[in-house]
Curated annotation (Swiss-Prot):
<feature type="modified residue" description="Phosphoserine">
    <location>
        <position position="48"/>
    </location>
</feature>
<dbReference type="Pfam" id="PF10180">
    <property type="entry name" value="WKF"/>
</dbReference>
<feature type="compositionally biased region" description="Basic and acidic residues">
    <location>
        <begin position="26"/>
        <end position="37"/>
    </location>
</feature>
<feature type="compositionally biased region" description="Basic and acidic residues">
    <location>
        <begin position="53"/>
        <end position="77"/>
    </location>
</feature>
<dbReference type="GO" id="GO:0005179">
    <property type="term" value="F:hormone activity"/>
</dbReference>
<protein>
    <recommendedName>
        <fullName>Cholesin</fullName>
    </recommendedName>
</protein>
<keyword id="KW-0597">Phosphoprotein</keyword>
<feature type="compositionally biased region" description="Basic and acidic residues">
    <location>
        <begin position="7"/>
        <end position="18"/>
    </location>
</feature>
<dbReference type="InterPro" id="IPR019327">
    <property type="entry name" value="WKF"/>
</dbReference>
<dbReference type="GO" id="GO:0005615">
    <property type="term" value="C:extracellular space"/>
</dbReference>
<feature type="modified residue" description="Phosphoserine">
    <location>
        <position position="52"/>
    </location>
</feature>
<feature type="modified residue" description="Phosphoserine">
    <location>
        <position position="96"/>
    </location>
</feature>
<comment type="function">
    <text>Hormone secreted from the intestine in response to cholesterol, where it acts to inhibit cholesterol synthesis in the liver and VLDL secretion,leading to a reduction in circulating cholesterol levels. Acts through binding to its receptor, GPR146.</text>
</comment>
<dbReference type="GO" id="GO:0045541">
    <property type="term" value="P:negative regulation of cholesterol biosynthetic process"/>
</dbReference>
<feature type="modified residue" description="Phosphoserine">
    <location>
        <position position="41"/>
    </location>
</feature>
<feature type="region of interest" description="Disordered">
    <location>
        <begin position="1"/>
        <end position="77"/>
    </location>
</feature>
<keyword id="KW-0964">Secreted</keyword>
Length: 193
């Protein structure tokens, strides 16, 4: 008998829920009503004495979702991008690795207190120090001073690479050699050997 009462209560609760939620035709559309929470509040307030707090919350969410869809549709039709897509399209420009490495070198030369060792910047400088386009002549003399203080495996690897590059350039056609690169290689080898 207890089970029968529960079933009876469940049926009446379900039936009352169906009656409480008004059909979509009767509810005012978000585009017709005023924008914001006020558009949905009359429907929710009408049903609020009959709805439980959870049911009311679910209904509010549904109405909010509908309003959001309508607004997106309106904006799409008007050709205006949403604020979220606008933020994604304009990331801030980052300085290039070359600029950062040369600033690092200048900071070292000026003995700024904010200067600190950065492995990635040093690696970039060591890889590109023979390229006159990436490390201009005005910075190369500073780079030589920086290389003087180079220690450990970085110093050994730099010497090995310089010797290897020198041998490769000696084996190539004299007309194809870059005089600037040869001169830089000699200076680095003289300094570190």
């Amino acid at each position: 008998m207890v089970k029968q009462k529960r079933k009876g209560l469940e049926r009446t609760a379900k039936e009352s829920k169906k009656q409480k939620i008004t059909p979509a035709e009767e509810t005012p559309r978000a585009s017709e009503a005023r924008p914001g929470k006020e558009a949905a509040s009359p429907v929710v307030q009408e049903a609020s004495p009959e709805l439980s707090p959870e049911e009311r919350r679910v209904l509010e969410r549904k109405l909010k979702k509908e309003r959001k869809k309508e607004e997106k549709k309106r904006l799409r039709e008007a050709g205006i991008a949403t604020a979220q897509t606008a933020k994604v399209q304009t990331p801030p420009a980052k300085p290039s690795a070359a600029v950062l490495a040369l600033e690092y070198l200048q900071g070292w030369a000026e003995k700024q207190e904010s200067w600190r060792f950065q492995k990635t910047r040093q690696t970039w400088l060591l890889l590109h120090m023979y390229d006159e386009d990436k490390v201009p002549e005005q910075h190369f003399s500073t780079l030589l001073d920086y290389l003087e203080g180079l220690r450990g495996s970085a110093r050994e690897l730099t010497v090995q690479k310089a010797e290897t590059l020198m041998q490769e350039l000696d084996g190539t056609d004299p007309k194809a050699r870059s005089l600037g690169k040869m001169q830089r290689l000699r200076q680095v080898l003289q300094l570190l050997s």
